[in-house]
């Protein structure tokens, strides 16, 4: 009589008890999120606003995509959620303002964070200033502050991955220019000047396309970054190289 073969879960699948517990946890998370205010729907995540344990919170949920294998989806979502939580913690340890992480729900790939109440995006602040003052001169102090913050971030070898003025907040009182960095979903750790240069190039492209006629503001930012970072020289050299590659691609089409 042949011995019975032990059955094992298919690659990437959870054993039955674990799968049931995971499904139950996801269901609880789904019920909780359904009672919150949806404030943003992106390609990779939904952002909700609500209360978590009595505190104003923002919840970022990386939802599954139907076109990916479930096991790959679970690994990718978990990895990006962990990366973002670690980046926020790394910022705060370095003295860079970022939301407090309240809780990480690995079952549903949800990140529960502090809501920066009363804040405005740097994008909205710049647009408002340009509308009222009709000149970028009033933004020089803001540019200097952004340069200092991003220099410190890069000196910690943290690459944001999606630097835009929408991913920077100003918390009240606005005139104090207290910048809070958010949305580290594409962040990673790297000491390479190339990666930091690309990070700055992404910001430059987003900045100048979103805020026309602010070239002098971005120049002030780079000057501040240069004087604030201990590693600025090779990074800015790489930024120039990345710009050149970008121009060549534009000419080729």
Curated annotation (Swiss-Prot):
Phenotype upon changing residue 81 to R: In GAMOS4; abolished interaction with TPRKB
Disulfide-bonded cysteines: none
Organs and tissues of expression: Highly expressed in testis. Weakly expressed in heart kidney and spleen.
Enzyme Commission (EC) number: 3.6.-.-, 2.7.11.1
Pfam families named in the record: Kdo (PF06293)
Active site: 162 (proton acceptor)
Modified residues annotated as Phosphothreonine in this record: 135
Gene Ontology BP terms: protein phosphorylation; regulation of signal transduction by p53 class mediator; tRNA processing; tRNA threonylcarbamoyladenosine metabolic process
Catalytic activity: L-seryl-[protein] + ATP = O-phospho-L-seryl-[protein] + ADP + H(+); L-threonyl-[protein] + ATP = O-phospho-L-threonyl-[protein] + ADP + H(+)
Keywords in alphabetical order: ATP-binding, Cytoplasm, Disease variant, Epilepsy, Hydrolase, Intellectual disability, Kinase, Nucleotide-binding, Nucleus, Phosphoprotein, Serine/threonine-protein kinase, Transferase, tRNA processing
Entry's localization field: Cytoplasm; Nucleus
GO function terms (MF aspect): ATP binding; hydrolase activity; p53 binding; protein serine kinase activity; protein serine/threonine kinase activity
Any single GO CC term annotated in Swiss-Prot or TrEMBL for this entry: nucleus
SUPFAM superfamilies given in the database record: Protein kinase-like (PK-like)
Region (Disordered): 1-21
Motif (Nuclear localization signal): 78-95
Residues engaged in binding ATP: 39-47, 60
Residues of the Protein kinase domain: 33-253
UniProt-listed PANTHER family: EKC_KEOPS COMPLEX SUBUNIT TP53RK, NON-SPECIFIC SERINE/THREONINE PROTEIN KINASE
Similarity comment: family membership: Belongs to the protein kinase superfamily. BUD32 family.
Free-text comment about domains: This protein is considered an atypical serine/threonine kinase, because it lacks the conventional structural elements necessary for the substrate recognition as well as a lysine residue that in all other serine/threonine kinases participates in the catalytic event. TP53RK has protein kinase activity in vitro, but in the context of the EKC/KEOPS complex, the catalytic subunit OSGEP switches the activity of TP53RK from kinase into ATPase.
Disease affiliated with this protein: Galloway-Mowat syndrome 4: A form of Galloway-Mowat syndrome, a severe renal-neurological disease characterized by early-onset nephrotic syndrome associated with microcephaly, central nervous system abnormalities, developmental delays, and a propensity for seizures. Brain anomalies include gyration defects ranging from lissencephaly to pachygyria and polymicrogyria, and cerebellar hypoplasia. Most patients show facial dysmorphism characterized by a small, narrow forehead, large/floppy ears, deep-set eyes, hypertelorism and micrognathia.
Function comment: Component of the EKC/KEOPS complex that is required for the formation of a threonylcarbamoyl group on adenosine at position 37 (t(6)A37) in tRNAs that read codons beginning with adenine. The complex is probably involved in the transfer of the threonylcarbamoyl moiety of threonylcarbamoyl-AMP (TC-AMP) to the N6 group of A37. TP53RK has ATPase activity in the context of the EKC/KEOPS complex and likely plays a supporting role to the catalytic subunit OSGEP. Atypical protein kinase that phosphorylates 'Ser-15' of p53/TP53 protein and may therefore participate in its activation.
Name of protein: EKC/KEOPS complex subunit TP53RK
Taxonomic source organism: Homo sapiens
Classification lineage: Eukaryota, Metazoa, Chordata, Craniata, Vertebrata
Gene (UniProt): TP53RK
